[in-house]
Amino acid sequence: MGNLLRHLPQLDALLSTAAMASLLERYSREEVADALRAALQEVRKGVQAGHMDSLPDFESAGFVSGVMAGIEARRRPNLVAAINATGIIIHTNLGRARLAPEAMAAVQAAGAHASNLELDLATGRRGSRYAHVEALICELTGAEAALVVNNCAAAVLLSLMATAQGRKVIASRGELIEIGGSFRLPDVIQQSGATLKEVGATNKTRASDYAQAIDAETAVLLKSHTSNYQIVGFTHAPQREELASLARETGTILMEDLGSGVLVDLSPYGLNDEPVVSDVLKSGVDVVMFSGDKLLGGPQCGIIAGRADIIVSLKKHPLCRAVRIDKLSLAALEATLRLYRAPHDPFQKVPVLRAISQPVEEIEARARRLAGELTVAGIVDVMCIPSRAYVGGGSLPQQNLESCAVTVIVPHLSPDALAAALRAARPPVIGMIREDRFVMDVRTLIDGDLPGIVEAFRQVALR
């Protein structure tokens, strides 16, 4: 091994070979050097692992081709459009909500041009970026005032820091949630400078538990919608109206972290456990916090809505600037919110809601069309099967939607190998493996995805 490593050529020597001359004509010296350095490192690892008993020919066409492939790989963007065939509508790893065309157009306009982000066009003086969406949020939720920050965790942190720093926050033991990435609500409360007071039991908490824990140091009663898990069986949780009455009597603030946050009723589509934001505020909750890129169907952001006096105090807090929403997300959010107003039907215009409400007959027709196009392209083992799709994004874990899927077997590739190859295709196709078949749930596809899927299979299965 040591003898082989001693014979590895120097980088400068390789760059001077005739084999590299053609690459240096097409690419910069820095690009070629970086790719060569990576190739040499791979050879070194192979020797050290005992996988190589001789060095490759560094001037061969195969080695040069590998270096060129490395250069091209470095030139490709890391963040690419992908096709979500998982059956999970709001897939966190795939970017959550797909934006509506109107939202994308708004992002393009805001990014390509100067805008009145913080300019009052009527007076010519400095304005507030929040003014572009605050009235819309209030109209759609019934809130007195609203504020938008960069994500829901920031919304919770800001809300608690501005109202409860140095004081107590009371929360039920059954609602001390953990979201993705191991971020836990107790940690957020601690970071806000407040002290957490847990009440009740994991499965049962009553309004009297909150009442007994309130003292002069208590600032906030905090509810959290357990959107990513459910506690069932011998359980009890107080009604929001009970806690709202208690908060009024004791001069405390009732806040609720709704997580996903939905502006419309999903029960007609069999999804019954997601509270509508306007209903939560009507019940007497003072402040709600929810995400913009989940069931709302907009960009990543955290929306805070509720009592005007509390929202004003949040806007004045120093943390507000540190977590403020950027102009592109703001543009996308405004455009998305407008799709909830007449004459628009959000279930037709907002992609997330369209995916949830889409009739299964349409999904089955799309599945048959995809299966037919794959068959025409030469993929012979293709089949349509019933499936179940999920909302995702930490929402409605116990509920699913009737769907249809297309399954594929490629003879020379195992399901795992096929899935890996499709992830490496352009566009990458992300599906599932069930019963030794690669499966694509069609509820999370749109008609425009089908040509990309066929092209990906051409790249992978027919080569």
UniProtKB/Swiss-Prot annotation:
Its GO CC terms are: cytoplasm
Q: Name one GO molecular function term.
A: L-seryl-tRNA(Sec) selenium transferase activity
Q: Where in the cell is it found?
A: Cytoplasm
Q: Hey, which pathway is this one from?
A: Aminoacyl-tRNA biosynthesis; selenocysteinyl-tRNA(Sec) biosynthesis; selenocysteinyl-tRNA(Sec) from L-seryl-tRNA(Sec) (bacterial route): step 1/1
Predominant localisation class: cytoplasm
Q: Which GO BP terms, alphabetically?
A: conversion of seryl-tRNAsec to selenocys-tRNAsec; selenocysteine incorporation
- Cofactors that this protein relies on: pyridoxal 5'-phosphate
Matching InterPro entries, A to Z? PyrdxlP-dep_Trfase, PyrdxlP-dep_Trfase_major, SelA-like, SelA_trans, SelA_trans_N_dom
Write down the chemical reaction(s) this protein catalyses.
L-seryl-tRNA(Sec) + selenophosphate + H(+) = L-selenocysteinyl-tRNA(Sec) + phosphate
Q: What is its EC number?
A: 2.9.1.1
Q: Which UniProt keywords apply?
A: Cytoplasm, Protein biosynthesis, Pyridoxal phosphate, Selenium, Transferase
Family matches, as Gene3D superfamilies: 3.90.1150.180, Type I PLP-dependent aspartate aminotransferase-like (Major domain)
Q: Name one Pfam family in it.
A: Se-cys_synth_N
Where in this protein does the record say N6-(pyridoxal phosphate)lysine is found?
Answer: 294
**Is Ubl conjugation set as a keyword in this record?**
no
What role does this protein play? Converts seryl-tRNA(Sec) to selenocysteinyl-tRNA(Sec) required for selenoprotein biosynthesis.
- Entry's family note: Belongs to the SelA family.
What name is this protein filed under?
L-seryl-tRNA(Sec) selenium transferase
